[in-house]
Amino acid sequence: MGQRQMHLGVYAVGTGNHIAGWRHPGATTSGEDFEAFKTIAASAERGKLDFVFVGDSLAFLVEGHPGQMVRFEPLTLLSALSSVTSRIGLVGTASSSYSEPYTIARQFSSLDHLSGGRAGWNVVTTTLTEAAQNYGYDELPEHDLRYEIATEFVEVVRGLWDTWEDGGRVVNRQTGQYYDPSKVHALDHKGKHFSVKGPLNLTRAPQGHPVIVQAGASTSGRQLAARYGEVIFAVQLDKDECRAFYDDVKRQVVAFGRRAEHCNIMPGLVTVVGRTDEEARAKLAQLMEYVDPTSAMRTLSRRFGHDMSKFPLDGPVPDLPLSNLMHSYNKVASSKARRLGLKLRDLYNEMALARGYPLVCGGPATVSDFMEEWFKDGAVDGFTLLPAHFPEAFDDFIDLVIPELQRRGLFRKDYQGTTLRDHLGLPKPENRFARAPQASAAAVE
């Protein structure tokens, strides 16, 4: 067996991932620039990354980061990108709170067909009151109820993906038979939140099921991730917290009857890369000159689900109740603050630097050392890269860090397959409706 290698994806934001990255000279500045996303996807494919990840929000957010203000709908964008790429995985976000299982099943199955088996669905429950108000509700459903709905939602979608067995479409011009009725099945789901008959009006996707991605860190979020998640986009601020998260989720994965290696933990990582450490630090210092202080505080408040501007920056991080909006960052940041004795200003500075994600700044060796340590210490299976801005900061990573990771044997030099499941080392799911092969009745002579 060869050396274990890490997985890498990139979180594609037209305005960059640093809170002020879009202000950098030469940076892309729009979430509506298809050419910019084509460039990101091409660089990701050139670097042999596993996937491009496109997030979403269902509302216009008056927040510090313009990536939350204007953005393409992910499935539309990824369908377009499928026609100008050939290997890179295409992961898009869609909400289980403001769609229907049949719609989501069709959309991601369509993307999987269009891309030749490269689709992934990032399941979110939506944390924005503004989104609820755009869909006819005054408030979000309660946190645990959102995850209860999401669990049934995902189960229905996976069931719909199985309603066609492989080989269900026959297309026999001589006999006039188009499909095999014995290989097409009704789902007939009747649950607490959804009633869905099926079958899907698409044949089985090339991957069987598009890859399921999840990012929950709350108790109910981790349960959803462990039950179904094949990639986990974790929000962890340091290695020890991430290793504890990793061990907990993997334990739950096994408890659900799955194999631990079929769930890849890939936390977000903001990267600022230079040819040397000194050059990288100069790049980060330049970025910080562009930061609007109020935008960092607004972002910090949204991540906590409370107005943090009411508290003194040089005081302790307040012990606040979990809001109905976001549990993940509040729990992780509060735990870190208690453990390390951090002040609110420390979290504010982290938000200004990297919007609450860990940040690594340095030359190829420094960045690779950081990633290798987390990987070999059992905290991650890889990373979802959040370059400070596009295209330059991402190209710096591809051109400088990827060769160093490859030299160390930590990352692939070429793709070994064509589908996202191939890249991630995931099997094609069995079809729940497929009949077991009949045992041979031939006599033994």
Question: Model-found features: residue ranges?
Answer:
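N-terminal beta1-alpha1-beta2 module of alpha/beta enzyme domains
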Residues: 1-85, 207-210, 435-445
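Internal, glycine-rich beta/alpha segment that forms the wall or movable "lid"
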Residues: 2-5, 100-223, 227-228, 254-256, ...
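Hydrophobic faces of well-ordered beta-strands that scaffold small-molecule active sites
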Residues: 6-10, 52-54, 88-94, 117-123, ...
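Active-site mouth loops of central-metabolism enzymes
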Residues: 20-35, 93-102, 138-140, 206-219, ...
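Short, acidic/polar
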Residues: 31-44, 214-227, 363-377
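Alpha-helix-loop-beta-strand connector modules within alpha/beta enzyme cores
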Residues: 65-91, 254-256, 394-413
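C-terminal helical cap(s) of enzyme catalytic domains, especially alpha/beta-barrels
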Residues: 135, 142, 153-158, 243-251, ...
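Substrate-recognition/cap regions that form aromatic- and gly/pro-loop-enriched pockets
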Residues: 329-400
